[in-house]
């Protein structure tokens, strides 16, 4: 454990178009090599596609998608007496958001549409309706935790 003082969390400014801190954070997740303008173009393009395809408010679809993807429990490896056990643990709120955003990005990358903004739009719509690759990732994580419920007493 470091003996120095704890470094304060940096405050992320809300994005200029929708005024959402979550969306600004997601843009940072999408960003590669510090190219924020490209990330903004992708995310705003995806949200515009969501608007045209669903007719709903894009920020609401985004929030709903993120909330649907957020995992509640995950498994962590714990070594006990020469054996590794997958111990289910509850996910902290900050990590929930981070995992949801990461899974959303990865699921969008693997889709078949031509451009990233179309892929992201499709994944956002799917996740907001409770389907898609990101939702499957969450369900798989929950299934793993459920299957290893017997080892929950190894929590630390």
From Swiss-Prot:
Instruction: Check the record and name the InterPro entries matching this protein.
Output: Ribosomal_uS7 (IPR000235), Ribosomal_uS7_bac/org-type (IPR005717), Ribosomal_uS7_CS (IPR020606), Ribosomal_uS7_dom (IPR023798), Ribosomal_uS7_dom_sf (IPR036823)
Q: How does it assemble?
A: Part of the 30S ribosomal subunit. Contacts proteins S9 and S11.
Q: Name one Pfam family in it.
A: Ribosomal_S7
Annotated Gene Ontology MF terms?
rRNA binding; structural constituent of ribosome; tRNA binding
Q: Which family does it belong to?
A: Belongs to the universal ribosomal protein uS7 family.
- Which PROSITE patterns does UniProt cross-reference here? RIBOSOMAL_S7 (PS00052)
* Keywords for this protein: Ribonucleoprotein, Ribosomal protein, RNA-binding, rRNA-binding, tRNA-binding
Q: Name one GO biological process term.
A: translation
Q: What name has this protein been given in UniProt?
A: Small ribosomal subunit protein uS7
Q: Which NCBIfam families match?
A: rpsG_bact (TIGR01029)
Q: Which GO terms describe its cellular component?
A: small ribosomal subunit
């Amino acid at each position: 454990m470091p003996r120095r003082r704890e470094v304060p969390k940096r405050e992320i400014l809300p994005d200029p178009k929708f005024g959402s801190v979550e969306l600004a954070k997601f843009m940072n997740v999408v960003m590669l090599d510090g190219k924020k303008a490209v990330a903004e173009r992708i995310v705003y393009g995806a949200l515009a596609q969501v608007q045209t395809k669903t007719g709903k408010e894009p920020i609401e679809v985004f929030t709903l998608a993120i909330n649907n993807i957020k995992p509640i429990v995950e498994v962590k490896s714990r070594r006990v007496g020469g054996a590794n056990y997958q111990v289910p643990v509850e996910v902290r709120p900050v990590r929930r958001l981070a995992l949801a955003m990461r899974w959303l990005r990865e699921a969008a990358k693997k889709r078949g549409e031509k451009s990233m903004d179309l892929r992201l739009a499709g994944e956002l719509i799917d996740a907001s309706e409770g389907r898609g690759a990101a939702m499957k990732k969450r369900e798989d994580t929950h299934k793993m935790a459920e299957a290893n419920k017997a080892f929950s007493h190894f929590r630390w």
